């Protein structure tokens, strides 16, 4: 089943809920896992039985299924703004619920989860909305529980001269996306947000995935290139919907794409992510 973005309630999501998106997210999952080595980086004691884990923005629950493999009888909850990709029937000990990060969470969920996880969702909100969402996610963790978030990051200043076309693309999107209610700088902000909402022991892992020719592993490099091209295609589609009086022109983005194609064919490109985690203060 395909659910188009126009049918999603109060959503800034720019991609349809269909098999193409499922394939893209599975490949993205595999890429990130290959470079982080594991799915749960927060220092949660994974030997404890009956851990309660929430995955916000779960899509089809694949992260939950994979993350649960080393755990003993975990209680898993997945949420998303659309039920279109929810597995039916759900896996054992797993429940799925419709939930937007901008809406109030169920009162019965407050202070109940050992781990609250979310990946690549906050960029689809404004900076203020992102901070509010993180505060609400933190409230779902039990005292002593953990919150782990993943967001994309822009190029570091030292990398901009190596990938000039990619830097131009980021700069264009950074100017364009606020008009869609997005925040491409979420990956730079999210670690600070964890501290701002009162979490402790905040940690961060920076993940860099070389794309195409820049990657010494041909398989991972090709996967990364396919994923990056898919995402860039979304921005191309979004730019075509800009109003005629917009200061951002689709033609400008097309020029950047031409240069980026040359860049990726000659030296490759780069994907960057921030994985951050923090602990809810324990009760005295």
Curated annotation (Swiss-Prot):
Signal peptide: none annotated. It comes from the Eukaryota. Its EC number is 2.1.1.-. Keywords: Methyltransferase, S-adenosyl-L-methionine, Transferase, Virulence. Pathway: Mycotoxin biosynthesis. One of its GO terms (molecular function) is methyltransferase activity. GO terms for biological process: methylation. N-methyltransferase; part of the gene cluster that mediates the biosynthesis of sirodesmin PL, an epipolythiodioxopiperazine (ETP) characterized by a disulfide bridged cyclic dipeptide and that acts as a phytotoxin which is involved in the blackleg didease of canola. SirD catalyzes the O-prenylation of L-tyrosine (L-Tyr) in the presence of dimethylallyl diphosphate (DMAPP) to yield 4-O-dimethylallyl-L-Tyr, and therefore represents probably the first pathway-specific enzyme in the biosynthesis of sirodesmin PL. Belongs to the methyltransferase superfamily. LaeA methyltransferase family. This is N-methyltransferase sirN.
């Amino acid at each position: 089943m395909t659910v188009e973005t126009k049918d999603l309630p109060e959503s800034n999501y720019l991609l349809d809920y269909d098999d193409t998106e499922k394939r893209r997210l599975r490949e993205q999952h595999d890429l990130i896992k290959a470079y982080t080595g594991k799915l749960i980086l927060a220092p949660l004691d994974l030997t404890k039985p009956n851990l309660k884990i929430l995955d916000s923005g779960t899509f089809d629950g694949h992260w939950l299924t994979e993350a649960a493999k080393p755990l003993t009888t975990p209680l898993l909850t997945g949420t998303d703004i659309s039920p279109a990709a929810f597995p039916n029937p759900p896996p054992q000990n797993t429940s799925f619920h419709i939930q937007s990060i901008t809406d109030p969470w169920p009162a019965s969920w407050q202070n109940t989860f050992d781990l609250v996880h979310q990946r690549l969702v906050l960029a689809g909100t404004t900076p203020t909305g992102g901070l509010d969402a993180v505060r609400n996610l933190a409230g779902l963790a039990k005292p002593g529980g953990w919150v782990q978030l993943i967001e994309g990051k822009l190029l570091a200043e030292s990398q901009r001269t190596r990938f000039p076309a990619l830097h131009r693309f980021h700069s264009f999107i950074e100017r364009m996306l606020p008009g869609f209610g997005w925040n491409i700088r979420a990956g730079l902000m999210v670690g600070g947000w964890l501290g701002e909402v009162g979490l402790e022991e905040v940690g961060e892992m920076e993940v860099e995935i070389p794309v195409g020719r820049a990657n010494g592993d041909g398989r991972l490099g090709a996967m990364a290139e396919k994923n990056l091209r898919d995402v860039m295609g979304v921005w191309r589609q979004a730019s075509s919907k800009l109003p005629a009086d917009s200061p951002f022109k689709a033609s400008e983005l097309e020029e950047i794409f031409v240069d980026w194609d040359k860049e990726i064919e000659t030296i490759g490109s780069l994907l960057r992510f921030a994985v951050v985690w923090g602990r809810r203060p324990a009760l005295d």
